Amino acid sequence: MIKSFQLSFTVLIVFTVLILGVVGNVEQKSQDWCWSIVNKDRCLQKECESLCSKKHPKGKFMCIPSTPGGPFQCHCRHPCR
């Protein structure tokens, strides 16, 4: 009886350590993202993509209107430092 309890306890501990490792790894990979305006006058897709990748190599670009119905601005989403 003690051996089965000891085995169950060992399996529970190993399982807990594995779960905590997976959760910690997922939390480590999630980063905070920051936004910066690369070009506030206009947003042409190729130009915006180029400017964003030059300024932030891991950045993703997006054209967002400055005001409803207004001109689009080039925004770059990148990992915060």
From Swiss-Prot:
GO cellular component: extracellular region
Residue pairs linked by disulfide bridges in the UniProt entry: C34-C80, C43-C63, C48-C74, C52-C76
Similarity remark: Belongs to the DEFL family.
Location(s), subcellular: Secreted
Gene from which this protein is expressed: LCR4
Keyword entries, A-Z: Antimicrobial, Disulfide bond, Fungicide, Plant defense, Secreted, Signal
Name this protein carries in UniProt: Putative defensin-like protein 148
Pfam families: SLR1-BP
Signal peptide residues on this chain, from the entry's feature table: 1-24
Top-rank lineage group of the source organism: Eukaryota
A GO BP entry: killing of cells of another organism
